[in-house]
Design a protein with these regions (language model features):
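Intrinsically disordered, low-complexity regulatory segments enriched in Ser/Thr/Pro
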Residues: 41-95
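Negatively charged, low-complexity tracts enriched in Asp/Glu with abundant Ser/Thr
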Residues: 1-40, 69-76, 80-83, 100-140
Length: 140
């Protein structure tokens, strides 16, 4: 069975060059968090356990799951994939990113606004690192 870190590396490799990817590896749990296009393309939590109450990630890959789950109690659906559906999760993430890019008249400006907003924010953005550049973006 693939580990959480193996799955995170696989997702990053498959999405390389398609979206900007920021990664945060939790220090107290076996979880990896990925945000795409400064959060405009949503986020992915990869873990071997259920998450903290109040923290909602649009996409989740949980290594102990056996089948796809969808939570619809909030404003947006949240998807829970078993590890063998990682490619489905990647396809769903890219479908959402493509939809968002079509929604914004100037996606590059929206990206810049999101980037500026995250500067100095505590939590994820304080500790995450840019691991893959997106379309037309290189990792500095």
């Amino acid at each position: 069975m693939a580990t959480v870190k193996d799955l995170a590396a696989y997702v990053c490799d498959k999405l390389a060059g398609k979206v900007l990817i920021h990664r945060y590896d939790a220090y107290s749990t076996n979880s990896v968090y990925l945000k795409f296009d400064y959060g405009l393309g949503n986020s992915l939590r990869l873990s071997d356990h259920t998450g903290k109450a109040g923290l909602n990630y649009r996409f989740n890959i949980i290594t102990t799951l056996k089948s796809l789950g969808i939570e619809t109690s909030g404003e947006y659906p949240r998807f829970y994939y078993p590890p063998d559906m990682v490619d489905k999760a990647i396809a769903d993430i890219m479908e959402g990113v493509t939809e968002k890019r079509g929604r914004y008249r100037d996606y590059e400006k929206a990206l810049e606004t999101a980037r500026t907003r995250t500067k100095g924010e505590r939590g994820f953005w304080e500790q995450a690192r840019l691991v893959k550049g997106g379309e037309g973006h290189d990792v500095p």
